[in-house]
Amino acid sequence: MIGILGRLDYTPSGKEAYIIYKSLFDMVHSYDMEVIGIIPNSIKKIKDIIDMCDGIILSGGSNESSYDNEIIKYIYDNNIPCLGICMGMQEMCMLYGGVMKDINNHHSDLKYAHEVVTKDSMIYGNRIIKVNSRHDSAIIKTDLDIVGKSLDGVIEMVEDKHKKFFVGVQWHPENLYMVSSDAKVLIDKFISSLK
């Protein structure tokens, strides 16, 4: 079972709601895995839910909860496989020495927005991969291993090589895994790391 962290968002009428994107459900279900949504309400209950999971996805979004840092630290300290996507990667980095800045050239509705050069990545080795991009801020420093950057120098992928699977990507593989072998490799590695 894979836990996906729900993100605070707003309905068209302005009411608060926790959401989990259907594309993430579809991606996990395509691997014959079940999904459990993790909605921040009590850190004790969240840890109990995380302990039931084989791995965790920290999804993208634009609003973090007050529990996010505790959740990520718990995942890290207990060596639970974790894939951070977009904001999820940013939160991973910020907890471990990260510095972030606003940018304005990495938001595109294109399937492939730019290339990322990977270096010593346990997923990709040393190569160039094509990714999508939908972020308005970027990590410029982190204590995690920086293993992928876009051609303009934006950090696009981080790992902790001492963990079973603690990987963050700035792009959205859940929108590419059906059409991109680069995205599929990442998801395959995450699934194969599950306890």
Predicted features along the sequence, with ranges:
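Conserved active-site segments centered on acidic
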Residues: 94-103
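Catalytic cores of DNA base-excision repair glycosylases
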Residues: 127-129
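Active-site-proximal beta-strand elements of phosphoester/diester hydrolases
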Residues: 166-171
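DNA-recognition element of transcription regulators
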Residues: 133-137
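N-terminal beta1-alpha1 cap of cysteine-dependent amidohydrolase-like domains
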Residues: 1-87, 101, 107-113, 117-119, ...
